[in-house]
Amino acid sequence: MNAAITATAKYLPDGILSNLDLERMLDTNDEWIRTRTGISERRILRDPEKATSYICGEVARQLLEKRGMKAEELDLIIVATMTPDMLFPSTACLVQDIIGAGNAWAFDLNAACSGFLFALNTGSRFIESGAHKKVMVIGADKMSSVIDYTDRSTAILFGDGGGGVILEPATTEGCGVLDNRMYCDGTSGKDHLLMKGGGSLHPATHQTVDDHLHYIYQDGRMVFKSAVTSMANVAVEIMERNGLTAENVSWLVPHQANQRIISATAERMGISSDKFISNVARYGNTTAGTIPICLAELDEENKLHPGSNLVLCSFGAGYTWGGVYVKWQ
């Protein structure tokens, strides 16, 4: 039994932080940012009283409405995020409360930018095993809460937002989440993309705050090299494992980190520009939110049809990376 995606949804906050705004804050300019990243603006959840659970709640309500489902019908909620409201309880538990899904158990999963694919794979297993019938998977991050807006190497990249899907048993033979490849390399990744403060190694103190340890640190050059290679490799691997070609892949749905990485992945796959989705110019990198936001936009624009072949791929901190093959139901 395969797991099929039966609903999609996204939420982007109204606040916009443009490249021109960043010009006034940092030693940077619009042309420099667009040339290196492809990003023109990003969304920001400005209300300090609203956190990642708010984004997830908005996504969850839409998913239920689109599917015509009651919250009580859900068996499981998985939230992929690296910016939870709190260390505990999990953001997924907060979402369960927000939507009133009293019969669902819930947990968070943190694989940074790869989080949604890891969560999608995990949720699919519960459907495939027959343990559950209705699983909600959400990827969301309030990245503005962990960005140092005096550091142009990271401030230009990230935005807030999220998206999600509902998984149910496929009703069409040969459709659903059909294959995946997930990878991790803690040896290479542990020093190049991280946030040092706030965990048990460096608990929050005046010193950790003064030292900016509660913000993302990224060695941009090293991360870029690894991301370009890993995302392209896993996307090609998914194609080869499943007999897919550039002609019969309907959509490449890549993590939206950087337009150059997206384009390099498509080029390795032989995919033309009309077969991959890119919204990084409008939203920046929403981390765990990028791929489900892309899926929701494709769905809203009626670009997903029964039998469409989708290759999803991502790369994130850890390092973590992966690819998923979905045949749309």
Curated annotation (Swiss-Prot):
A Gene Ontology MF term for this entry? 3-oxoacyl-[acyl-carrier-protein] synthase activity
Q: Where is this region: ACP-binding?
A: 256-260
The family database entries (Pfam families) matched by this protein are listed as: ACP_syn_III (PF08545), ACP_syn_III_C (PF08541)
Record's function text: Catalyzes the condensation reaction of fatty acid synthesis by the addition to an acyl acceptor of two carbons from malonyl-ACP. Catalyzes the first condensation reaction which initiates fatty acid synthesis and may therefore play a role in governing the total rate of fatty acid production. Possesses both acetoacetyl-ACP synthase and acetyl transacylase activities. Its substrate specificity determines the biosynthesis of branched-chain and/or straight-chain of fatty acids.
Organism listed in the record: Chlorobium phaeovibrioides (strain DSM 265 / 1930) (Prosthecochloris vibrioformis (strain DSM 265))
What pathway or pathways are given for this protein in its record? Lipid metabolism; fatty acid biosynthesis
Record-given protein name: Beta-ketoacyl-[acyl-carrier-protein] synthase III
* Catalytic-site annotation from UniProt: 113, 255, 285
So what family is this one in? Belongs to the thiolase-like superfamily. FabH family.
HAMAP family given in the database record? FabH
Q: Give the record's subunit note.
A: Homodimer.
Question: What's said on domains?
Answer: The last Arg residue of the ACP-binding site is essential for the weak association between ACP/AcpP and FabH.
Q: Name one GO cellular component term.
A: cytoplasm
Keyword field: Acyltransferase, Cytoplasm, Fatty acid biosynthesis, Fatty acid metabolism, Lipid biosynthesis, Lipid metabolism, Multifunctional enzyme, Transferase
One biological-process term from Gene Ontology? secondary metabolite biosynthetic process
